[in-house]
Amino acid sequence: MEDFVRQCFNPMIVELAEKAMKEYGEDLKIETNKFAAICTHLEVCFMYSDFHFINEQGESIVVELDDPNALLKHRFEIIEGRDRTMAWTVVNSICNTTGAEKPKFLPDLYDYKKNRFIEIGVTRREVHIYYLEKANKIKSENTHIHIFSFTGEEMATKADYTLDEESRARIKTRLFTIRQEMANRGLWDSFVSPKEAKKQLKKDLKSQELCAGLPTKVFRRTSSALRILEPMWMDSNRTVALRASFLKCPKK
């Protein structure tokens, strides 16, 4: 799984995920599924924001990289991808500027067009189940929730999907590609099922002839790994570094 992640995701995303796991003492060589999940969530957040701007009339527009209008204001403020201190600083600034209610938990994005925070979810399970879990945790009508699955399904608060159909299709296609590439490498079942992940981990450890004292237990504790990424101020140039992430994963 680790090799797959390094091949499939943009190096910047991989580096951010590595730092996140290291900060919380999580070994990416053991918790490879979490490593893949963090990278996937980061990429979806970036793809959600990329190419979306607000013009001088306050209208939301989609702009490609080579368009001179790329200096326009980004429609979305990316909160995910920053360390906690920086992230809360951004949230507080947004609240002070827009009058938005401060969320209890760090959201992933802020939508300047619809003036609301957004929580992005990527699930390997049923979208409605994950949506309800998110809603029960957040317990706020002021944070918009948008859930994507690896099967092309999605669910959003009040069926308001925020983005245009083409932008959402791009995200769904990327997630489906990740699933297919995992399946081609025999990784998908273990990514979905903790029991299968444990079996795969033991198999990998045995094949690599690692030391006998290395833990083989798959940890399933909940952490804030997604919230402690390094500061990464997003500007109009960020899409250049991320564009490679949108390409299909290289075949084995």
Swiss-Prot record:
Site (Important for efficient shutoff activity): 28, 65, 202-203, 206
Sorted UniProt keywords: Decay of host mRNAs by virus, Eukaryotic host gene expression shutoff by virus, Host cytoplasm, Host gene expression shutoff by virus, Host mRNA suppression by virus, Host nucleus, Host-virus interaction
UniProt comment concerning the protein's domains: The probable endonuclease active site in the N-terminus and the basic amino acid cluster in the C-terminus are important for the shutoff activity. The C-terminus acts as a nuclear localization signal. The C-terminus is recruited to host protein complexes involved in nuclear Pol II RNA processing.
Name used for this protein in its record: Protein PA-X
Recorded GO MF terms: RNA binding
Matches recorded under InterPro entries: PA/PA-X, PA/PA-X_sf
Alphabetized Pfam families for the sequence: Flu_PA
Family: Belongs to the influenza viruses PA-X family.
Function: Plays a major role in the shutoff of the host protein expression by cleaving mRNAs probably via an endonuclease activity. This host shutoff allows the virus to escape from the host antiviral response. Hijacks host RNA splicing machinery to selectively target host RNAs containing introns for destruction. This may explain the preferential degradation of RNAs that have undergone co- or post-transcriptional processing.
Positions bearing the site annotation: Important for efficient shutoff activity and nuclear localization: 195, 198-199
Compartments, record wording: Host cytoplasm; Host nucleus
Species: Influenza A virus (strain A/Swine/Colorado/1/1977 H3N2)
Annotated gene: PA
Active site location: 80, 108
Gene3D superfamilies hit by this protein: Influenza RNA-dependent RNA polymerase subunit PA, endonuclease domain (3.40.91.90)
Recorded superkingdom: Viruses
GO terms of biological process kind: viral RNA genome replication; viral translational frameshifting
